[in-house]
Every structure is written in C-alpha cells, then in structure tokens.
C-alpha cells in the first residue's frame, strides 16, 4: 500500500507470466494474442525471450494503446519490484526493455512496441498525435517519450488508428423533463448522503442549488460526466487573468442556466469544484458516479462539455450525442474524430494552454448564440449529433483487416 506503482507492476508481471504459461498449453487453439497497454506489455517480451514460450511465436501478437502516458516503468535491477527479480533467467539489460529517456529503467510498453506485429491507438487523430513529442508548454500530449519508436512502427506499416465504437441498442427515446432529471438527482444525492456521511455537506450544497433551479425550467442545461483528473478537468481549472476557465464559462451563462457536473477522482480537483459550486449556484457539482444518473444527464442536457487536454478516444461524447445532446470539445484525439464543429457539435483548439482557454470561451459563446438566437440551426446540430454512428462492427472490421490478418 505504501508503494502502489511497484505493487501494481509486480502484479502485472506475474499476470503476463501466468497468461503466457496458460497460452503455451493452449497455443494450438489461438490465432491472435491481443495485448493492452503496459500492463500486458511484458508478455510480448517473454514471447520473444523465454525458451518455454517458443510456441507462442506462431501467434500474431498485437497491441492496443489506450493511455500512452502510463508505461509501467520499473528499475532493471536492485529492487524487489524490478525486472531482474521478476525474471532472473532473463537479461535485465535486454535492449527490448530500453526506455529512450532513462538508461537504468525497464519499460514494458516500449518492449511491447518493439516486439509486436501491429499496434493501434483508439482513434485516427491520436495515432497521428503520438508521432510527435509531448510539449507541455504548448499543452500538447503526444508520444510521451516513445515517439521515435512509434515513428519507426508507422514507417513499417505497423501503427494504425481505429476509433472505438459505441453501443446503440439502448438509445434514449425521449428527453427527460428537467423535473424528471432533478428527481433522479435528488434520489441519488439522498442515497449518497446516507452512504457517505462525511460528504453530506457537499451533497447538501448540490441539493440546495438544484432546488433553486427546479422551480422553473432553466434556459439552458449544460452537463459534464467525467473522471476528475488533470486530463479531464485541468483546462476547466486553468487560470487566466486570475480566474479559472470554469468561472469564465459560468459568467457567460444566463442567470437561470444550470451546469450539472457529475464525477469524482482527484481530491484536489473535487475540492476546487466544490469551492466553485459554493460561490455560484448555477454549478451543481455531483461528487460521485451512478450509471442511471449519468444516463439521465446524457439524455436531459442541452450542451455537453468535454474540454479534455488529451483524449485517445473518449466515450462520454458518444453517449451524449447518442441521446441527441451536442458536445463542446477540445479537438484532440477521438474528440476530433467524432465531433465536427458547427455540424454535430462545437470544438476548439489552440497552440498553447492560454489560447485553448480563450478559444474554448469563444466556442462557448458561439454555441450559446446558436442555441438562443438560431433555434432551427440548433435543431439541425442536435439531429446531426443524434444521427452520428460510431459502430463496433466498423471497428471490428478494421481490427480484422489491419491487426489480425
């Protein structure tokens, strides 16, 4: 518990070994070995280096990258959670393990990128982004130190971008009324308050703000459903001229607007959002997650906010669009591949964080102008969002054609 990265790495090293040993016994029944992220990356190396895993070499081995920022870095030797301790029969200085930045580190993800037959990330835009180096000064998330390896893979025809799909078997048929939504929120807050008495004051604040809004239909309902991490909320809390982007967004709204934000995660981000909610009742911060509540929020909102700093694919924007709620997004990764500015939603970009904040605000003001002043145009955008389809059958066909054959 005091060393979670080491503990997790050891667990996944054991998982790779155990999965490989099982596959050796059942290799004739398999055609493709599909690995995901660093957690399974060592299996690609074991397939190459362990004599007992020789039978696995006839299997096509492919890798999907969901989050390149997490790479499972561990010492090569000299630590209980090191490559030498996990696999004493193998060379801890194996070049397949080399990290492009740190000489004494074993990088499971780098080993997999070097070893597998094909690699994909979960959107075409992200597959292009990761070929460039990450530049935090520009607010750009790219190859996270592995861009040269990925450039080599792309040059070899081994790197692909395949957009994730969305389930369309349960499309909301009707938009809930605001009264229906507030009833769902109120019931959820009561349940959470009973389960988490230490957070009761936060839930009471959300209930109070909600009660102020429920007496009449808000002029516009903004929504967000998210894990609260720097990736998801960092731009909202970025400060320019002494105030956050979230404060700017709230100030741009009519007095009878509502922003429902559902999510939990980083305690510092939770605290910051609670402080914003305490000073502006238009923000209803729902700390936690409930799938029925999330579905109600997706179905009942007018505009869904997703200004992620990076987003390999994203799924929340697909859920919102499926329900007929246009999205305002940062045009990165899968958000760029799913939300088309002024067609089925709104998007922004910028060469640095300051420009991204300014352009997000400009996009927000534009979206409100369309919503309030051009109702027919807004309905066209709603219809385009609802009609968009990102099918798993299409993704599966691409996996078969590009990765498995």
Residues of each region from the PLM?
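Catalytic cores of nucleotide-sugar-dependent glycosyltransferases that transfer UDP/GDP/TDP-activated
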Residues: 1-405
């Amino acid at each position: 518990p005091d060393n979670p990265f080491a503990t997790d790495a050891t667990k996944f090293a054991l998982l790779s070994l155990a999965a490989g040993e099982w596959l050796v016994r059942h290799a004739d029944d398999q055609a493709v070995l599909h690995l995901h992220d660093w957690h399974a990356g060592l299996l690609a190396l074991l397939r190459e280096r362990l004599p007992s895993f020789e039978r696995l070499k006839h299997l096509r081995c492919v890798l999907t990258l969901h989050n390149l920022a997490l790479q499972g870095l561990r010492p090569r030797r000299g630590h209980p959670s090191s490559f030498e301790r996990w696999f004493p029969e193998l060379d801890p200085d194996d070049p397949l393990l080399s990290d492009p930045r740190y000489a004494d580190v074993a990088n499971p993800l780098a080993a997999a990128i070097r070893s597998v037959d094909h690699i994909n990330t979960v959107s075409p835009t992200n597959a292009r982004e990761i070929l460039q180096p990450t530049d935090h000064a520009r607010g750009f998330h790219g190859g996270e130190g592995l861009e040269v390896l990925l450039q080599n893979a792309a040059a070899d025809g081994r790197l692909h971008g395949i957009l994730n799909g969305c389930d369309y078997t349960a499309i909301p048929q009707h938009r809930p009324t605001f009264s229906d939504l507030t009833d769902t929120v109120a019931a959820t807050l009561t349940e959470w308050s009973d389960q988490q008495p230490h957070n009761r004051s936060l839930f009471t604040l959300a209930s109070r703000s909600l009660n102020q809004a429920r007496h009449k239909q808000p002029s516009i309902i903004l929504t967000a459903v998210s894990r609260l991490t720097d990736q998801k909320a960092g731009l909202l809390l970025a400060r320019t001229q002494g105030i956050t982007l979230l404060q700017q967004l709230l100030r741009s709204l009519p007095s009878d607007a509502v922003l429902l934000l559902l999510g939990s995660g980083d305690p510092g981000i939770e605290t910051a959002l609670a402080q914003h909610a305490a000073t502006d009742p238009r923000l209803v911060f729902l700390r936690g997650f409930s799938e029925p509540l999330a579905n109600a929020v997706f179905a009942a909102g007018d505009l869904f906010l997703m200004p992620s700093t990076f987003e390999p694919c994203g799924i929340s924007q697909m859920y919102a669009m499926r329900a007929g709620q246009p999205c305002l997004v940062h045009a990165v990764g899968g958000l760029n591949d799913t939300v088309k500015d002024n067609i089925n939603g709104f998007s922004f970009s910028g060469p640095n964080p300051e420009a991204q904040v300014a352009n997000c605000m400009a996009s927000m003001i534009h979206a409100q102008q369309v919503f309030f002043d051009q109702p027919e145009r807004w309905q066209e955008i709603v219809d385009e969002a609802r009609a968009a389809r990102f099918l798993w059958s299409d993704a599966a066909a691409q996996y078969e054609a590009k990765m498995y054959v």
